[in-house]
Amino acid sequence: MTTSVEYIPVTPIEYPDEDGKPMAEGDLQRKCLVYITTVLEIYFQKRPDVYVAGNLFIYYEKGYPESVVAPDVFVVFGVEKRDRRSYKTWEENDKTPNFVLEITSKATRSKDQGAKKGIYAFLGVREYFQYDPTGDYLNPQLQGLRLVENNYFPVATNTLADGTVSLPSEVLGLELRLEAGKLRFYDSATDKTLLTHEEEANARKAAEEKAQRLAAKLRELNIDPDSL
């Protein structure tokens, strides 16, 4: 007697690339997200082993697509710099983010300070920063946490002479600064704020126009600007 075995096809596990929700709640959040990802990509452009991403799903348990988190911005060291539709830790030698930043809003505040914080600690995210571009839902407006023995502790805040708030990121080697309520990344090695390509072009144009006005003023005074 021959025993037949019924073949039951195995349905492949799907790991969605999106959840249908908008990337950002409003213009402030969107502009902030674009600024952060852009300047960090520029800053690490010569590092093929540093991956910067924004609003990308991170799946951290193979076979369990519900084990997922989507940071607004994250940076991973020690992985290939390439485009991804999602980030699956088991495909990246179990590398998890070293740095995460959440752009906090009314809808995300409780999750950013609760469930996500726990997940990031579980994943070993060394630094976790939060920023509220409106200043309405997070006080102080810019906050940082650093992981020490599986627990997060606040990153010390420095207030500069001009009132600028500064928090150092050991992971990035940069400072996160709050200038008039606006988040900027600052490189102390070059003493410069990180700018997008568009901001650099605008700053260069403004400097050129200022120089032209000054030269014109000197000529009015019968002074050759080229002689100075």
Where are these regions (language model features)?
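A short acidic/basic microdomain associated with nuclease active sites
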Residues: 46-58
